Swiss-Prot record:
Keyword annotations from UniProtKB, A to Z: Ribonucleoprotein, Ribosomal protein
Gene3D superfamilies: Ribosomal protein L28/L24
Pfam family of the protein (one): Ribosomal_L28
Keyword Acetylation listed: no
Family: Belongs to the bacterial ribosomal protein bL28 family.
GO CC annotation: cytosolic large ribosomal subunit
Descriptive protein name: Large ribosomal subunit protein bL28
One annotated GO molecular function: structural constituent of ribosome
Gene that produces this protein: rpmB
Length: 98
């Protein structure tokens, strides 16, 4: 399991700890990842994802997982999230047609 957000592609970054004497030591900046279960209203099912706390705030701000994925850039999404986006779009298209 990689340390990458499935919705925003936030990943591990590297940098330096810098002391008062300007000594530099390598370090890693880890994203704040949380395991969450989000509800897809279009698919009527629960979806487990590993996303950053920032992405969780964005999902809630946009009004849920379906709305977030509708606006999300495909390049940033994980393979699972891309599949979800397609399924949700297909389901919404069926509902509009019916």
């Amino acid at each position: 399991m990689s340390r990458t957000c499935e919705l925003t592609a936030k990943a591990v970054q590297t940098g330096n700890n810098v002391s008062h004497a300007n000594n530099k030591t390598k370090r890693r900046f880890l994203p704040n990842l949380v395991n969450v279960t989000l509800i897809s209203e279009a698919l009527n099912q629960n979806v487990r994802l590993r996303i950053s706390a920032n992405a969780l705030r964005s999902v809630e701000h946009r009004g849920g997982l379906d709305a977030f994925l509708a606006k999300a850039d495909v390049k940033e999404l994980s393979q699972r999230a891309r599949l979800l986006k397609k399924q949700i779009a297909k389901k919404l298209a069926e509902q509009v047609a019916a």
